[in-house]
Amino acid sequence: EPIKHWTEKLNVGPFFILEHLDLKDVYYYGKNGEENEIDFSVALAYSGNMQIELIKQHCDTPSIYNEYVNHKKNTLHHLCTFTKNIENDIKILESQGYRNLQGGKTMDEGTFSYLDIDNNLSPILEIAQLSEGALGMFDMIKEASINWDRKKPIMDLGEISI
């Protein structure tokens, strides 16, 4: 349903679905461990230079994603910025009052953290230090959006030819 809204009403697409992302070293409010394994998928698209990320969690593991849904929020969840030194940026943000809510690593050694300053849960700030492979994938998805003909709202990454 959300993809249909973005593609038909807002002319954003195509979306690329990454199913059941594999993360490691996930923490949630400072708690590490196996109990924090989150099963979720994302659908990615671009509108100009802005990446749209639709997240669907498939489990009941506590996370900022289902915490948001449980609070029945219907607004922007988070904004993301990329960094080359995530540890330093986290320290700076925490010194300014931000709380590190959730984070972890991707299988290609990218690192991400979600931070909030006022317990409002909207919008949360995500900072991510990504691998070259992830940045390249995002570039390919962005390029696919430029000449999108609206015929296929959902595409497979293998369909991208640049």
Give the location of each predicted region.
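Short Pro/Gly-enriched beta-strand edge/turn motifs at strand-loop
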Residues: 23-30, 96-98
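Glyoxalase I/VOC metalloenzyme domain signal
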Residues: 1-16, 32-41, 46-97, 116-162
